[in-house]
């Protein structure tokens, strides 16, 4: 029995011996000869070829571009046990070992190694089928291998995750393997077909996890909706990890809502809020998906009063989607004055008088009890302009802004000057009528439900939001304001939405139902 200290000293002494060049040359030649003999063995060659091929699909780092099997020992038994993989950028370049890799590349290589083994096992099966008496290996491969990977995002760089997911899909496509991966990373989730996802959520009452499939519209009957929802959940995978999802119309909501929330309650990421733009389309499918996953949500839609399909049409659309999503029709359509709407009355809602603004506002307030809010009277861009128009105008320099030609003076005047002077120009009145049309679209109304000030604001709406990029306009305006100034300038509907979101996150409001 040798004391460990003696062994350590012996190894240390052997490492500092001044070996002759002849001895080092002879050993190197023998090892090279041994490696060549080793690589000629059919089973080794098969595995080495597979390893090199599979590794190229995982990594693109030039230092480790070529992977091959090598060993270094005095006898065949020990050599085989000490077989290792080496990497080299070229045939004559420096060799690297696994130990010299970072954690991420090392993790990636181990997965590549599993991929190689599965590939070889497939070749083993074919060998057994062709000639069972002469095979490269003396064992039968397993019928099925389950490859389970836990949260690879912890060790693998983001730019390599896509390659990893692609290769795991290839592994899962093999006849002898199944791949299972857990992840909290949106970068991974968005690369997985929603139909292949299984969603785990902790049930705090049962103290156990519930497992669910992802609910998508029926592909056969609703092909367009199926494609839209499928791509939407892939584009916004953050919703799976959210404590609360806010469904908005588009890019503007993604800029404005976080800005106000952060001014009032802090970072949306810390709060666990995900804002998903759905463009007002297929809202009931999003609701069904989030209901099935038991993720609470709030919806913010444009009212689009006097636009085609807006106003009463938009309210009717939301009511229909709520009914389709399982809400009680008799409760939803119960009015204070005349009881429950008949089918005929409900079907005719889109044609109700758009000037009945008080009645429309009553329905809007009712739908807020179902966590459906409206940017009124038009959309969130117009609402922000109405709330803090001067802030948006302050982002322009003296050479910017809408202008018109004044026939009387023969000059081009800026709208800002005309508004400040208070002079009446027929050209200005004509411009207002033109931009009312631009704002409400070709099939829209004449703007009679809007006040004179709101009609004038449509000139600025056209300039800021129809002729320029919405996100950049909002960013430029909101970045001028401090958190305190933002708090003082919250549109009332956004104030109510934020309060509702806060109550849901604190657990003191029923989620997605009238209370």
Sequence positions of predicted segments:
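Short beta-alpha junctions and helix-cap segments that line functional grooves
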Residues: 54, 71, 167, 183-185, ...
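Acidic, Mg2+-coordinating catalytic modules of nucleic-acid enzymes
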Residues: 232-247, 251-515
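Extended helical coiled-coil dimerization/tether regions that scaffold
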Residues: 8-147
């Amino acid at each position: 029995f040798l004391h460990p200290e003696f062994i350590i000293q012996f190894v240390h002494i052997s490492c500092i011996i001044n070996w002759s060049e002849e001895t080092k040359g002879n050993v190197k030649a023998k090892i090279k000869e041994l490696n060549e003999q080793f690589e000629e063995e059919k089973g080794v060659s098969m595995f080495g070829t597979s390893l090199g091929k599979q590794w190229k699909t995982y990594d693109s780092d030039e230092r480790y571009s070529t992977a091959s099997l090598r060993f270094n020992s005095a006898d065949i038994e020990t050599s085989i046990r000490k077989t290792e993989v080496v990497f080299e950028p070229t045939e004559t370049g420096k060799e690297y070992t696994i130990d010299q890799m970072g954690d991420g590349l090392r993790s990636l290589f181990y997965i590549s190694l599993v991929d190689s083994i599965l590939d070889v096992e497939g070749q083993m099966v074919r060998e057994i089928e062709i000639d069972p008496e002469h095979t490269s290996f003396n064992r039968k491969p397993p019928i099925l291998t389950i490859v389970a990977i836990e949260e690879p995002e912890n060790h693998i760089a983001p730019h390599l995750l896509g390659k990893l997911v692609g290769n795991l899909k290839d592994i899962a496509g093999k006849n002898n393997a199944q791949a299972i991966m857990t992840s909290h990373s949106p970068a991974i989730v968005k690369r997985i077909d929603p139909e292949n996802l299984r969603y785990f959520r902790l049930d705090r009452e049962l103290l156990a996890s519930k497992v669910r499939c992802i609910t998508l519209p029926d592909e056969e009957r609703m092909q367009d909706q199926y494609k839209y929802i499928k791509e939407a959940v892939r584009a916004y995978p953050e919703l799976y990890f959210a404590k609360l999802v806010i469904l908005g119309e588009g890019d503007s909501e993604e800029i404005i809502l976080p800005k106000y929330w952060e001014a009032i309650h802090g970072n949306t990421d810390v709060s666990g809020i995900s804002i998903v733009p759905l463009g007002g389309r297929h809202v009931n499918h999003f609701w069904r998906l989030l209901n099935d996953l038991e993720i609470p949500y709030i919806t913010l839609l444009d009212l689009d009063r006097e636009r085609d399909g807006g106003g009463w049409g938009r309210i009717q659309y939301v009511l229909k989607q709520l009914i389709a999503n399982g809400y009680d029709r008799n409760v939803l359509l119960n009015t204070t004055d005349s009881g429950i709407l008949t089918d005929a009355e409900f079907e005719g809602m889109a044609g109700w008088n758009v000037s009945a603004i008080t009645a429309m506002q009553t329905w809007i307030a009712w739908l807020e009890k179902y966590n459906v809010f409206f940017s009124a009277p038009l959309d969130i861009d117009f609402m922000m302009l109405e709330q803090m128009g001067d802030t948006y105008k302050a982002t322009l320099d003296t050479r910017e802004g809408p202008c018109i030609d004044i026939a009387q003076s023969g000059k081009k005047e800026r709208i800002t000057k005309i508004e400040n002077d208070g002079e009446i120009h027929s050209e200005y009145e004509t411009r207002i009528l033109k931009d009312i049309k631009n704002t409400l679209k070709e099939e829209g109304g004449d703007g009679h439900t809007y006040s004179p000030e709101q009609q004038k604001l449509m000139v600025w709406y056209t300039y800021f939001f129809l002729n320029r990029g919405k996100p950049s306009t909002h960013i430029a305006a909101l970045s001028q304001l401090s958190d305190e100034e933002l708090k003082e300038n919250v549109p009332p509907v956004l104030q109510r939405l934020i309060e509702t979101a806060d109550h849901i996150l604190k657990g003191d409001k029923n989620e997605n139902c009238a209370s």
